[in-house]
Amino acid sequence: MSLSPSERPDTVDRKLLDILVCPVTKGPLEFDPARQELISRGAKLAYPIRDGIPIMLPEEARKLG
């Protein structure tokens, strides 16, 4: 069951962002609240957040241009 847009959080817990890193580059991630993604600038990948859970699998990530 997916959350509706109005139920999605606009932020990610700061502690979670401090812990999570890109599995490809081991670099930092940025939260994009509009797309519900964690962005790795180094790997040029956007990891989806589904039902409040970050999906940190490179094969599930969207490639950035």
Swiss-Prot record:
Family annotation (Gene3D superfamilies): 2.20.25.10
Q: Name one Pfam family in it.
A: Trm112p
Q: Which GO terms describe its cellular component?
A: cytosol
Q: What span is annotated as the signal peptide, if there is one?
A: none
Please indicate which superkingdom the organism of origin belongs to: Bacteria
Describe the family membership recorded for this protein in Swiss-Prot or TrEMBL. Answer: Belongs to the UPF0434 family.
* Protein's name in the database: UPF0434 protein Rpal_0270
Give the originating organism.
Answer: Rhodopseudomonas palustris (strain TIE-1)
